[in-house]
Amino acid sequence: MSTGDRRVCLLTGAGGTLGDAFCRAYAASYDIVAVCRRRAPGVPSQHEWFVDPLDPDAAIPDNEARVFVVYADLEKQGEVERVVDIALARFDDVDLLVNNAAYTFLHPQGVVDGDVVLDSVERHFAVNVAIPLRLATRLAQRSWLHRDLRNRERNRNVVNVSSLSASRVYPGGQAVYASSKAALNHLTRHLAAEFGEFGVRVNALAPNTFPSIVSTETVADAIVRLDAESVTGRVLVVDADAAAEAAS
């Protein structure tokens, strides 16, 4: 069960830069299922329990703000379903799905530099498009479908972490990565139309490079902003000259 009135968040890529920042900033606000491939976020999890040796019965704040870590390789068959089942078994429901896990392979020499770029296409689209689709679909099938009123009451939604490169051309060999994120943006719009039928919103977040151009904390805050709003089918841009602006 969730803790009190806190929302339940299923977060992928929890051990990365953004996932870690989100857990650090919002572990006290959300019950977070932190999905990691290898490295867990740097916050207390169900694997730790803190005790004051001078007062063993004292309440320790870190014990109330723990994340529930799940190690999974979402590229392997059946792992998405396992993660969804674990999240629902632990908390009964999920209010917010954050598809943050991503694959990035840049090719500064261009797409014609041998076969290395072509060989990366399948994995880019598998991780950046197919896995978010599968997670959202399985969660809808196993929890959200036919629960329109409850979904609207809880303002349930999906946030897909995309990239500003999905709509702009940057140097550095981002052609395949950017194309996969552009596909994620359009997938977001289609899912918003379909999931709206049972009261679930779907949006995407398109940050510039973090933390070098935009602070990671700003991007994490933008996820929470989308969670709190009522908008659906939109891409929220997070750039240095505009902390968060809507983009169609």
Give the location of each predicted region.
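Conserved glycine-rich cofactor-binding loop
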Residues: 15
